[in-house]
Design a protein with these regions (language model features):
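Short, solvent-exposed loop/turn segments at secondary-structure junctions
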Residues: 180, 195, 245-247
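Conserved polymerase palm-domain catalytic core
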Residues: 206, 216-218, 222-226, 230-336
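Beta-strand-loop-alpha "switch" segments that mediate conformational coupling across diverse proteins
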Residues: 203
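Conserved catalytic motifs of the protein kinase core domain
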Residues: 171, 184, 235-237
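Non-catalytic, polymerase-adjacent accessory regions of viral genome-replication enzymes
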Residues: 1-172
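Catalytic nucleotidyl-transfer cores of nucleotide-processing enzymes
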Residues: 191, 195, 237
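Short helix/loop capping segments that flank catalytic or ligand/cofactor-binding pockets
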Residues: 104-106, 115-116, 183-186, 197-199, ...
Length: 336
């Protein structure tokens, strides 16, 4: 049991988004460039050049910039250094955020690895892969994009923006559900900078912009209140709420492809890809469910890949189809 000094607790309660005073200019410069380049990837190569030119002078001036000093910044800097030293001396601790709520959680590293490991030991959902599939993924991606470019489906600029030649596999981590008994974990997979991230985002943008939303779609709680304002219920009416458990890992690939294919008419005129090529790319992304945790490579054996930009829209349209089919089987008309 580790006892956290009050000043360490105070510092950690600031949260991960709190802006701390900068004490390491070289690291600040590198991080600044990394964030800029990460966002520039979203633009066309021609658009990146003038932005880089404008940023050159800013980057050059960072080392000579004198950041303001005051008692608050000095106090925060001392707290930061104290907390950093404390964590370096307690390497069995892991800091993360809670699954819900703006809360920083300190975990025992052994317990964290065990609990996340328990999730990954579900043989019906995950399997360990002995050989790194990254090179094969990149090779298959290049083959797909080259075929598209050679047939004139995409431009050379789009080809370059979608091709990842040095990507890494998606990375998994766990977030504690501190609001539940025994504090179970939610498995999260981050696919940013993975080989198929840009392709998945490309497909996602086409679908999200053109697929119609369900008539039952609610944007937020305010929209819900507005929709319910004029609904009058009888005394014997029932209000039900349904929750999907582990949605992404329970959607069959063939069902996902069927839902996309049935909506092809909405994107046919705005997409230069033939339906067969578009569906082939969707299948490629959905079947590439590799990720790493604690230096072990896993493959999700069923469902849509967690962490992929493509999975949310796929889950949405599959649920739309399920909702429509379920409502059509009812012997009465539900209200709402």
């Amino acid at each position: 049991m580790v006892n956290f000094p009050p000043e360490i607790q105070c510092f950690l309660q600031l949260g991960e988004n709190f802006s701390l005073p900068h004490i390491n200019t070289p690291i600040l410069t590198i991080e600044f460039i990394k964030h800029i380049e990460c966002n520039l990837r979203k633009l066309s190569p021609a658009s990146r050049i003038p932005i880089r030119e404008k940023l050159k002078s800013i980057i050059k001036n960072i080392p000579s910039y004198s950041f303001p000093r005051n008692s608050h910044n000095d106090w925060l800097t001392r707290l930061y250094l104290t907390a950093k030293n404390f964590l370096q001396n307690n390497k069995d601790l892991i800091l993360t955020r809670a699954d819900k709520g703006n809360v920083t959680v300190a975990l025992d590293k052994f317990d964290y690895l065990n609990k996340v490991g328990d999730l990954l030991r579900d043989e019906n959902t995950y399997t360990i892969i002995n050989k790194d599939p990254t090179k094969k993924l990149i090779s298959n991606l290049k083959e797909l994009l080259s075929r598209w470019k050679n047939h004139g489906y995409i431009s050379n600029t789009t080809y370059k923006s979608l091709l990842f030649t040095d990507g890494i596999l998606p990375r998994a981590y766990g977030l504690p559900k501190i609001h539940k008994i025994n504090i179970p974990f939610r498995l999260i997979v981050s696919s940013i900078n993975s080989p198929l991230y840009s392709l998945a985002l490309f497909l996602h943008k086409i679908m999200i912009k053109n697929f119609p939303t369900a008539s039952s779609h609610i944007n937020n709680s305010f929209d819900l209140v507005q929709n319910l304002a004029d609904v009058h219920l009888d005394d014997d009416s029932l209000l039900i709420s349904l929750d999907a458990i582990s949605l992404f890992t329970n959607i069959p690939t063939d069902l996902a492809l069927s839902s996309v294919s049935s909506r092809w008419s909405f994107i046919r005129d705005v997409c230069d890809l033939p339906e067969s090529e578009f569906l082939s790319a969707v299948r490629f992304v959905l079947n590439s469910t590799f990720f790493t945790f604690n230096n072990i490579i896993y493959k999700q054996t069923f469902g849509t890949p967690m962490g992929s930009p493509l999975s949310p829209i796929i889950a949405d349209i599959v649920l739309q189809d399920l909702e429509e089919k379920a409502l059509n089987t009812l012997r009465f008309t539900p209200r709402g």
